[in-house]
Amino acid sequence: MRVLDLILALITAAVVGYTIALVSNSGCYVHFDGRSATTTCPPGPWVESIANGLYTAGLARPHPEPECERRQSSW
């Protein structure tokens, strides 16, 4: 997944009110638990800062770990 695609996906997910649990075809994903974001994509820190920024701005909602697992397995 290209960097721009991932950023746009994060923004789109936040704007339409979906929780953040994004998975690319490569199996890399971003999981946001309401306190911090984690990602399997290197480099992780910039992705985490975007997700944290969206949450701080009130544009993202937390979700439980199983939700991330369901989305990851369905993509």
From Swiss-Prot:
GO cellular component, as recorded: host cell endoplasmic reticulum membrane; membrane
InterPro entries (UniProt xref): TGBp3 (IPR003411)
Top-rank taxon: Viruses
Residue spans, topological domain Cytoplasmic: 24-75
One Pfam family hit: TGBp3
Role description: Plays a role in viral cell-to-cell propagation, by facilitating genome transport to neighboring plant cells through plasmosdesmata. May induce the formation of granular vesicles derived from the Endoplasmic reticulum, which align on actin filaments.
Further facts: TGBp1, TGBp2 and TGBp3 seem to act together for cell-to-cell propagation. TGBp1 is the main movement protein that physically cross the plasmodesma with the viral genome. TGBp2 and TGBp3 would facilitate TGBp1 function.
Family: Belongs to the Tymovirales TGBp3 protein family.
Protein name from the UniProt record: Movement protein TGBp3
